[in-house]
Amino acid sequence: MSKIISVGISEHKVASDPVVLVTYGLGSCVGIALYDPEVRIGGLAHTLLPAPVREVQGAERTAKFTCWAVDLMVEELLKCGCAPERLVAKLAGGATMFEPQYRSAHGGIGERNVAAAREALERSGIPLVAEDTGGDYGRSLEFNTATGIIMVRALQQPIKQL
């Protein structure tokens, strides 16, 4: 059985050994997985918000913000031996967890997190190969870096494989 590494809210982890990266309770948050299938190295981020509301200095950049999570993981993945042209992405979460009256004119947090993730991936030239986003339910993810497979678990929903 593979070692399990938990990725908390606003965190990202990169693993160069075969492990299972897990994150729990993705509601409007987004889980972004990056993977290099040739070297079997991957990373997982659990992002909270699309972007900061004020300018933040470089040292303060964290995976709390979806707009930065991809860049932070790519930087670490390249140090571990990944090639940028081999990276692929999978995305899950971004649910609508609150009633419509609590959403802004730009959509709910979940929708904006998904949009920010897609923009960051496009900016980095990383193809999005699978996703399970939206809906009105939370998700938990298990990302096996030996296979690149993500198991998506949600209450009263069938288990999905990305």
UniProtKB/Swiss-Prot annotation:
GO BP of this protein: chemotaxis
Keywords for this protein: Chemotaxis, Hydrolase
Claim: Hydrolase is one of the keywords in the record: yes
Catalysis performed (reactions): L-glutaminyl-[protein] + H2O = L-glutamyl-[protein] + NH4(+)
Pfam family, one: CheD
Coiled coil: none
Superkingdom classification of source: Bacteria
GO molecular function terms listed in the Swiss-Prot or TrEMBL record: protein-glutamine glutaminase activity
EC number: 3.5.1.44
Functional description taken from the UniProt entry: Probably deamidates glutamine residues to glutamate on methyl-accepting chemotaxis receptors (MCPs), playing an important role in chemotaxis.
PANTHER family recorded: CHEMORECEPTOR GLUTAMINE DEAMIDASE CHED-RELATED
Family that this chain belongs to: Belongs to the CheD family.
Protein name from the UniProt record: Probable chemoreceptor glutamine deamidase CheD 2
Lineage: Bacteria, Pseudomonadati, Thermodesulfobacteriota, Desulfuromonadia, Geobacterales
Name of the coding gene: cheD2
